[in-house]
From Swiss-Prot:
Chain ranges on the Lumenal side, renumbered to this chain: 1-28
Name of the protein in question: Non-structural glycoprotein 4
Record note on domains: Binds 1 calcium ion per tetramer.
Species whose genome carries this gene: Rotavirus A (isolate RVA/Human/Italy/VA70/1975/G4P1A[8]) (RV-A)
Residue numbers on the Cytoplasmic membrane side: 52-175
Amino acid sequence: MDKLADLNYTLSVITSMNDTLHSIIEDPGMAYFPYIASVLTVLFALHKASIPTMKIALKTSKCSYKVIKYCIVTIINTLLKLVGYKEQVTTKDEIEQQMDRIVKEMRRQLEMIDKLTTREIEQVELLKRIHDNLITRPVDVIDMSKEFNQKNIKTLDEWESRKNPYEPSEVTASM
């Protein structure tokens, strides 16, 4: 562990990588050298980051299989992103979590649809009752005795003095 985090060790690995590259590629005009160097740099960075992380994770974790699987999936996804793929590798656990989330959302939507359907049925029943109450039924004879405005009205013939009591008459005032 100390050897992996040692700066001298890191510099010696980089120096040995550079020496190896220069010995393999003798021609200085090689066009692919920057690409090869960047890929090797990324691989070295992954090596330096993943080995200590996995060692610490395996020591502290109770379930080493899941940790190794997660680390490998993360490394593969990183490499796929570097190459330019948009797809990602997923584990069974992630797929099951997504399926559970989808099923939970579908249940929630079905409950909401059920509530809305129940409310709509209640509204339709209420509208039917209102419609039934508003339907006018033809009546042969209208009983006007229950009308308040028509109770005490007498015609001119029915008045005793044959004079309309509601017509204004002359008013005399005392002085």
